Amino acid sequence: MAYWLFKSELSVWGWNDQVTKGDVGEEWDGVRNYQARNFMRDMAVGDLGFFYHSQKEKAVVGIVRVCAAAHPDSTTDDPRWECVDISAVRPFTVPVTLEMVKADERLADMALVRSSRLSVQPVTETEWEIVCGLGNTDPE
């Protein structure tokens, strides 16, 4: 299993929007960055990810599961762009803010800190466990 981070602006698509889609999930569409697209191509059904609110809140607020592998993005006719589908698993007990992540030296190399603008990012297993611990949330 691999771990990921999905960033979204709360005003565009927030955690509560994701939860309303249930186990069927929703396309993580609209990504127009080649590196982020390639990360989605690497994802497998069952992989887990952090749901991160960017902009105002800047915090990990939930855990999602990849429920459909990479496929053409339905928001464009351009075949270069693909997306995965994700479904909500559970909210974080305590949101983990970007400040908390940056303050933890163990997370200094995390993509969220190094490549903060990338909308889809890999997360190592160690980073996954640390962030879940900071949020008092079960990593499984």
Identify the meaning behind each predicted range.
Residues Y52-K58:
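Short, charged beta-turn/beta-strand-edge "cap" motif at the junction between a beta-strand
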Residues M1-A44, D138-E140:
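Compositionally biased, charged N-terminal/linker segments
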Residues D17, P95-V101, V131-L134:
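Short, charged, solvent-exposed linker or helix-capping segments at domain edges/interfaces
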Residues V123-E140:
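Charged phosphate-binding loop/patch that engages nucleotide di/tri-phosphates or the phosphate backbone
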Residues K7-E9, V89, V123:
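Structured loops at beta-to-helix junctions and adjacent beta-edge loops in soluble globular domains
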Residues S11-W13, T93, I130:
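Short, acidic Gly/Pro/Ser/Thr-rich loop/turn segments
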